[in-house]
Each structure stands twice: as C-alpha cells, then as structure tokens.
Swiss-Prot record:
GO terms for cellular component: extracellular region. Has antimicrobial activity against Gram-positive bacteria and fungi. It is found in: Secreted. Disulfide bonds: none annotated. GO terms for biological process: defense response to bacterium; defense response to fungus; innate immune response; killing of cells of another organism. InterPro entries: Megourin. Keywords: Antibiotic, Antimicrobial, Disulfide bond, Fungicide, Immunity, Innate immunity, Secreted. Its main location: secreted. It comes from Megoura viciae. This is Megourin-2.
Length: 63
C-alpha cells in the first residue's frame, strides 16, 4: 500500500501554479519543477494578463 508521503506526492505537484518572472525563466524553472513526483511533466507557461509585469504561471500535465 502507499504511505502518506507517496500519497502526498501524487496529490501535490509543487510546480503547478508556480509563478516566474519572464517567459524564458518560466520555461526553465517549470520544466524542472514538473519533473517532480506527481507532476506528470511540463505542459506550458501561461502569461498572467498584466502589461507591466511579465509574469508567467507554470502548468504541469497533472497536479
């Protein structure tokens, strides 16, 4: 059976929803973050709508 830590890693992907400054930084950081257990790999970096701030939100395939 799964222990609590294994269950937590499946339910919780720390990269999901992380915010980065700049598209390039997001792509690098998000790819690394989405390799963690429970994340399912990199999906995309979504630009947060704000003209002044170039911030991007990380999305993994699961989480």
């Amino acid at each position: 059976y799964l222990d609590v830590n294994q269950i937590a890693s499946y339910l919780l992907c720390l990269g999901q929803g992380a915010v980065f400054n700049g598209r390039k930084t997001c792509q690098i950081g998000c790819r690394a973050a989405c390799q963690q257990p429970g994340c399912g790999g990199y999906k995309e970096c979504e630009q947060i709508p704000n003209i002044r701030l170039h911030k991007y939100r990380c999305h993994c395939n699961s989480g």
